[in-house]
């Protein structure tokens, strides 16, 4: 007889009770929040043709795909590492004629080729919303506000929104602080590390003020305004300031203008969501462009949440009373109690024990009695 194995590939795990049910409840709560704001749910497939999927991807994301050859079509398929580009494909094709702004929500598993340092999972749940057709201040404010509300609905407190300007170095290097493509990459790396000495060694002293323009929103924004002496960034800064003003009573606000992690395709603004009691980010979002069928680009804003840490921490886990139904119980009474919200477990033999089966009550006639 072959020995049974419970070994799973590195970065994958089973979700067991009560975490699986808690995860479903949290997912439902977040999606209900998005639906209450008019975001209609779509559900793209886990697998797509590699060339179709990568055609909408940028940066290092293309190297994070799990690929295999379809034995039927002999074409290379890929497992999605992110749902956002799939939403873009749907918006540009199946829903290209739908009225704009188009509000869509989604939830599904994504798979990574490699695990991260903070989260070793290679498969994780991604829930999000995309507002397609505009990246105005009003649209961005709605997206950030809805993201905060969704996290609050999931049970998080002490939420912080950290704003960033993903394409800031691109804008500056093409204007008042010129850099070659290679130099720009080096400057981004030094800014990521907040390494003032490294910037000086590169001869990029003009970028040094960006390291100081980080922290509580009002102070950091004031430093960015001082840095922007020629008003090249004025419209972007005004936009981010307006978004912040619209949500200032809903979350703590910070600004890190050069933060790039997780912002491979966002442009003029991005944001990261943090919560009290958790080390890593709860989600990210921002503005971006979607390629259309006719070769143009369509503006959009959106966010993605990764609720795995919340589920692991027991969020949305709500212990419920469980009613044991003995052999020969009153089926009408049991049905009526289930309609009231009771969870029942029916005995299948005389040896079934209520406590062993995790029950908190047993049915005595027509009434539940605590064990």
Where do the language-model regions lie?
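Acidic, His- and aromatic-enriched active-site or binding-groove loops in soluble protein domains
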Residues: 64-72, 177-203
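Beta-rich nucleic-acid/ligand-interaction surfaces
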Residues: 46-62, 164-172, 259-268, 352
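TRNA-binding/sensing appendages of the translation machinery
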Residues: 1-80, 85, 141
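Hydrophobic mid-domain F-helix/FG-region of cytochrome P450s
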Residues: 146-153, 167-177
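Short internal beta-strands
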Residues: 160-164, 325-326
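Cap/lid and interdomain-hinge subdomains that line or gate substrate/regulatory clefts
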Residues: 131, 135, 139, 162, ...
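Positively charged, Gly/Ser-enriched RNA/tRNA-binding surfaces
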Residues: 2, 22-37, 48-49, 84-95, ...
């Amino acid at each position: 007889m072959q020995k049974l194995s419970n070994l799973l590939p590195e970065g994958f795990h089973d979700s067991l009770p009560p975490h699986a049910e808690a995860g479903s409840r949290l997912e439902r709560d977040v999606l209900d929040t998005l639906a209450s704001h008019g975001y209609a749910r779509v559900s793209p497939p886990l697998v797509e043709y590699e060339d179709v999927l990568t055609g909408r991807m940028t940066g290092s994301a293309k190297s994070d795909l799990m690929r295999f050859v379809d034995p039927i079509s002999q074409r290379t398929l890929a497992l999605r590492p992110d749902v956002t580009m799939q939403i873009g494909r749907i918006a540009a094709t199946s829903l290209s004629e739908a009225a704009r702004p188009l509000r869509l929500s989604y939830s599904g598993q994504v798979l990574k080729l490699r695990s991260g340092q903070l989260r070793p999972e290679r498969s994780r749940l991604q829930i999000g919303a995309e507002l397609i057709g505009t990246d105005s201040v009003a649209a961005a404010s709605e997206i950030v506000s809805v993201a905060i509300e969704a996290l609050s609905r999931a049970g998080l407190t002490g939420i912080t929104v950290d704003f960033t300007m993903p394409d800031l170095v691109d804008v500056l290097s093409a204007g008042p602080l010129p850099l070659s493509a290679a130099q720009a990459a080096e400057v981004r790396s030094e800014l990521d590390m907040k390494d003032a000495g490294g910037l000086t060694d590169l001869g990029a002293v003009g970028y040094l003020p960006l390291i100081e323009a980080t922290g509580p929103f009002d102070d950091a924004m004031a430093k960015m305004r001082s840095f922007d002496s020629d008003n090249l960034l004025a419209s972007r800064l005004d936009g981010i300031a307006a978004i912040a003003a619209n949500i200032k009573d809903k979350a703590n606000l910070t600004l890190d203008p050069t933060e790039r992690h997780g912002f491979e395709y966002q442009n003029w603004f991005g944001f990261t969501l943090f919560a009290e009691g958790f080390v890593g980010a709860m989600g990210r979002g921002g503005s971006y462009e979607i390629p259309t069928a006719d070769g143009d680009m369509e503006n959009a804003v959106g966010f993605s949440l990764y609720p795995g840490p919340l589920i692991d921490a027991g969020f949305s886990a709500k212990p419920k009373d469980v009613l044991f139904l003995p052999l020969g119980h009153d089926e009408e009474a049991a049905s009526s109690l289930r309609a009231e919200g009771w969870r029942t477990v029916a005995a299948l033999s005389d040896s079934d024990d209520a406590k062993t089966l995790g029950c908190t009550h047993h049915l005595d006639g027509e009434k539940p009695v605590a064990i």
